[in-house]
Amino acid sequence: MKKHFLCVATALLLCNFLFAQEITELNGNKVKTTSLTETLQHIVDTGRITGLSVSIIENNQMVFNNTFGFKNLANQEKMDTNTVIYAGSFTKPMMATLFMQLVDKGIFELDKPIFHYLKNPIDSYPKWQTLAYEKDFPNITARMILSHSSGMPIMRYFYGDSLYLIAKPSEKFYYSNEGFNFLGFVVEEYTAKKLDDWAKELIFEPLGMKNSGLVWHPEFKANHATGHDAEGKSLGVQVKPTAKGAGSLVTTTADYAKFLIALFQKQLTSETSLDAMLKPHIKITSKRGFGPLRDTISHQFDAINFAWGLGIASFDTPFGKAYKHGCHLDGWQSYWTVYPQKKMMVILMSNSDNLEKSMYDLLEKTIGDVYAPLEWSTDIQRVEKKL
């Protein structure tokens, strides 16, 4: 990997004022950007989405970058393309990328038991000490954590006050914030360097992501979004003073597009590392990813080979393998999907609890995506699916 290649995505996006007058959808249909803008505004208005930022990439170039609605509804402050938005679980693909960059540097190994990188026994760290009672903890590797198969729960608080494994490592998919946060802790502990500093060095600064951080920076105060519930009530701002591997990223859709372009163009990691990230590691066999249905056994997604790689989910479509990730937190809902064979991607970020209700429409109207398995992570079902 050569450093000067890292400038490619940035150079492309610096020209984002030259937006296309038409958007080409996955199936080849063309939609005028003026028409798309009107359609998206209608979806935002009727869906009561407080604020929405949309970036569409075709052939590794930004062809659409626009915002709708408000960053702060109570103050009637409009969202703009430089408004930073709390990105929640969008952090996870970035955490996975950052870790693989450190693997490329020879600092970490993907399949070495993670406890080897701790400077002290696990029971000496108050937040993680209960893992000492888990006989399978010594078997957990970074690969398992990044593919959500470590056996750690999504959040310990669903199971009590302490952290314990809920499955045998490598045997079952359980989406886990705890796992990603633990991996972030290990990186900081072993390297004696903060995650945000690593991200600045390896991702943000090389790609010119000036509106991004894994922690809250003072400059974000000038133009930031506030989270809102389904009724439009303010839920405040997510100010994270410390980085979390599972979800502390603050960014814009334009900045995140720079990251995705560089990642899928093999400009951030070695080809071997990217292949490992995108390769299906564990099949999704549950009807839902969250809530009581996460323990169900279902063949609902067998036909599309829905699976998780390292920090990124994948599924089959008529246009080849596609990749995706989302964010769901009170007041914040976001989603991105990438179609590498079509060189197409869309990033949607909102400060509203109402985004997911309109997600099917938004994906279909932006790039003609009617294939993403959104129902796995939300109770909103697709009314009609075009095949």
Predicted regions and their residues:
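Glycine-rich, acidic and aromatic/proline-enriched surface loops and short helix-turn segments
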Residues: 62, 147-155, 201, 205-209
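Bacterial Sec-dependent N-terminal signal peptides
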Residues: 1-26
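Catalytic loop of the DD-peptidase/beta-lactamase superfamily, centered on the K-T-G motif
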Residues: 21-67, 171, 188, 193, ...
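Extracellular/periplasmic catalytic domains that process cell-envelope and extracellular macromolecules
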Residues: 48, 78-79, 109, 133-140, ...
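Proline-centered turn/helix-capping motifs that create local helix->coil transitions or kinks
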Residues: 153-157, 211-222
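Solvent-exposed coil/turn segments that connect beta secondary-structure elements
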Residues: 59-61, 71-73, 150-151, 219, ...
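Active-site-proximal loop and beta-strand segments within enzyme catalytic domains
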Residues: 70-184, 191-193, 197, 225-233
